[in-house]
């Protein structure tokens, strides 16, 4: 029986190690000033940058969001293999009550889809409607994977 245990344990450890190597290394990308990070594969994270909408690119829309109660607003930007930068998604952080007040039930959500709700606060994603890259290219595959991640609440971790 002891031989079986000692022979089985190393085999199970090798199997576990082999399985864990199949999944990509995940990296936390801070969304500050939104108090969350998003976990993405390392090979996608190297293409991402976070831009504070209010300080970097203020606009009439960012002012409207702030007046509606947005506490923080950031862009997730994606740098393609050819070096061009593309706005991928907007991330908005609201008190739940302010978010609900800003919504018109007869229209699409102004600030995107609610992805995280925690402690009377919400994280909203206003993401791409369509891929900006050839779906067969590496950028297209990264974009599709990132799209799935930004709409998955489990991808977000409170900072």
Segments from the language model and where they lie:
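C-terminal motif of bacterial Sec signal peptides marking the signal peptidase cleavage site
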Residues: 15-18
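Bacterial N-terminal signal peptides that target proteins for export
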Residues: 1-8
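Short, hydrophobic/aromatic-rich segments at coil-to-beta transitions
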Residues: 24-28, 70-73
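Short aromatic-glycine motifs in intrinsically disordered, low-complexity regions
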Residues: 26-40
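Bacterial signal peptide processing site
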Residues: 20-22
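Surface-exposed amphipathic alpha-helical segments
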Residues: 125-159
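Short, surface-exposed beta-strand/loop micro-motifs that present aromatic residues
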Residues: 108-117
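Secretory pathway targeting signatures of secreted, lumenal, and periplasmic proteins
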Residues: 39-92
């Amino acid at each position: 029986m002891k031989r079986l245990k000692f022979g089985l344990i190393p085999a199970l450890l090798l199997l576990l190690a082999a399985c864990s190597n199949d999944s990509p290394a995940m990296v936390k990308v801070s969304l500050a000033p939104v108090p969350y990070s998003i976990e993405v594969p390392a090979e996608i994270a190297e293409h991402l940058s976070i831009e504070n909408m209010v300080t970097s690119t203020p606009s009439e829309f960012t002012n409207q969001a702030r007046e509606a109660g947005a506490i923080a607003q950031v862009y997730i930007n994606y740098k393609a293999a050819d070096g061009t930068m593309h706005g991928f998604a907007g991330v908005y952080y609201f008190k739940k009550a302010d978010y609900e007040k800003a919504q018109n039930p007869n229209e699409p959500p102004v600030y995107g889809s609610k992805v995280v709700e925690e402690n009377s606060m919400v994280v909203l994603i206003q993401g791409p409607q369509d891929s900006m890259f050839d779906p067969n290219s590496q950028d297209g595959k990264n974009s599709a994977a990132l799209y799935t991640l930004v709409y998955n609440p489990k991808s977000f971790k409170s900072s």
